[in-house]
Structures are given as structure tokens and as C-alpha cells.
Amino acid sequence: MAETIEVPAGGYRYIPGVFQYSAGVRALDGYRIERAEFARPVRLADGFAFIERYLQQQGIPLAGFCACELRSPAAFTDAGFVAFNRHYVGTLERWGVMRDDKNPVARSNVCPELHKPAEPSFHAFCFTRPVPGASGSFVIAGSGEAEEGHAAYRDRTVRFGDTSPAGLREKGIYVLNRMEQRMAAVDATWADTTATQVYTAYDLHPFLGDEIVRRGAAQHGLTWHFARPPVVGLDYEMDCRSVPVEHRVA
């Protein structure tokens, strides 16, 4: 099980991941994670500017920014994904949230099949707020059906290129197991979640009941986004969270 690292200034601890995002975050005792979803996608630069103003108006330090959900117009090549991520983390470095390639912020980044944004954009973000007696809220970062942190995703992808029912089932099982491993690292299970999201352009019904619902991953329903993971060749992604307060922002 992965060891978590505390971010006292942000009021949370995180599961170390790759330089572009952590594998998940959990609020420290006395803090609550809240989620804010944009009414429509907001391009990256404008989204970061909005988040900075929003947190300042709420009296929350930038260190409290702990997770986000992005939308991109199309899947990246491996090299393109690295270049995008270097651009993305630049703001986190400027904010002092990320140092020495250690990124505490959880993230998902997916590509809608329809109604695509013109450029990479924010869909939602999460932050911590001091609340006496609060505990237990968490966000698990998105994961596709490949081992992360390698130069070529293709070489570490489950059933690469196989979108048959059997192939998708195996991809789905891999990702569900990854979600459970990450939740275990923050002392949580499916029973603690308030929302589960899946991102795929393929039919998940053949394993929806047997694999997703049966293990408790859809106790509050399942939000299915008709979208693809952010790297060419990946077909299935999930994330989940336990967030007691959610907002809609302009």
C-alpha cells in the first residue's frame, strides 16, 4: 500500500504519483474537501485565474487547491502528453503547490467524444476548507488501463487495441482494482464514496453489473461520461470521490 504525504499548509495528504498529478488526496482532520464544477469548460489559463481569485475570496490559501478535472479536445501522443503536463504544472509551481517535480494535486483529464472543447479546459476543481470536526473526505485521481510513469503507455496497457467485450472487461477490472488500491491508501472503500465517474466511448454494460455494481462502486449511481482517456490507445478511465459539499460556479 502506498504511503501518503501530508501537506499541512493545504490541509490534506496525498498518494505520490507521477509529476503531472498525485494518485489521490484525503483531507486532514479538521478540514473538508469541497468540489466546484464549472457550468461549461473554461480554458486552462482562464480556469487557473478563476480558481486563484475564488480561493482568495474564500480566504483559502492556494495550497488548499487539491484536485481538478480537465477536458481536452483530443487524446495526446505520449510526447504531446508530457509537453501538455509540463505546461499545466507551471502554474502549480508558481503557486508554490508543486516543488521538485513532487505534485500533490490529484487530477483527471479526459477527451469528450462530442461537444469537444477548443483547447484543454477545466471542468471542475477541489479545495480544502477548515471545518471543526470534519474528516474523511477524499478524491481519487483518474486512472486508465495502463501503468503510469513510463515513456510509452502502449507498452504498459491492458489489452492494447482490444475493444471487444472481453477486452473492455479486463480493462475495467484493472481500473477498478486501481481505484480500490488508491482508496486503501487513504483508508477508504467504495462504501465511503459519494460519486463514481467512468470515461469511455465503448459499451460498459456487459460488465456493469458483475464488476462495477457488484463490488459497490455504484452505490450512488454511476456517472458515465462519453469520453476517452487523454493518451492515444487508452479506452477506459475512472475516478471517484467522497466530497460532502459541491458547488456550481460560472
Regions found by a protein language model. Give the residues of each.
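Short, polar/acidic, helix-capping and beta-turn segments at strand->helix junctions
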Residues: 1-250
